[in-house]
Amino acid sequence: KYASNADSMKIRACYNSIPAQLAKDNKKFQYKVVQKGGSATLFGASIEWLNLAGVVLKCQRINQAFEPIAVYADLSAFKLYMGDVGLLTMKSGISQQTVLSGEGNTFMGALTENYVAQQLAAKGYDLYYWESSSTAELDFVLQKGSQIIGVEVKKGEHVRSRSLSVFVSNYKPAYSIRLSLKNFGEKDG
């Protein structure tokens, strides 16, 4: 479906805000980043258009991680990732040298998280993230059959994650996943 001129300006504004949205400590989508005084009423249809077109990946917040996970989605809270991490790299203006070295840049965490979102979506997973009363946040929560799986993404080799520990303690999943630059390993808990 083609968008009107007025709608296309809102769509573009939402799309252009994604690097800034992901650069924040709290990556939850905020309409005020798109435009001062922005709201779901003003930009909600634009975000839906981008999502349905496959240009962005919408990751809904859940406050509980039980099967079926979709019924625990908070439709008012979400993150938006670019549908292609290469587009995020280009839109953010981060240099190739910084990406290749992977060091000393806080935006590398956003790129890494976007890459994981893209790969999970390509494998057919619906994207959710978990937040516990604003004290802990887990990057992704997946449902595979009847299993709920927590996924924590770390940009470097520092792998300590209080959020993943809180998630595991609360929900006792069969397993959880921590992605980082460290070599693959398996550990109880």
Model-found features: residue ranges?
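Active-site beta-strand-loop-beta-strand hairpin of nuclease catalytic cores
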Residues: 142-150
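Catalytic cores of nucleic-acid endonucleases
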Residues: 155-189
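Short, glycine/charged-rich beta-strand-loop motifs at protein surfaces that mediate ligand recognition
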Residues: 104-106, 150-155
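Hydrophobic/aromatic beta-strand patches that form the interior of the parallel beta-sheet core
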Residues: 81, 128, 151, 175-179
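A short local loop/turn or secondary-structure capping micro-motif enriched for an aromatic residue
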Residues: 66, 146, 158-161
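Accessory nucleic acid-recognition modules appended to NTPase machines
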Residues: 1-142
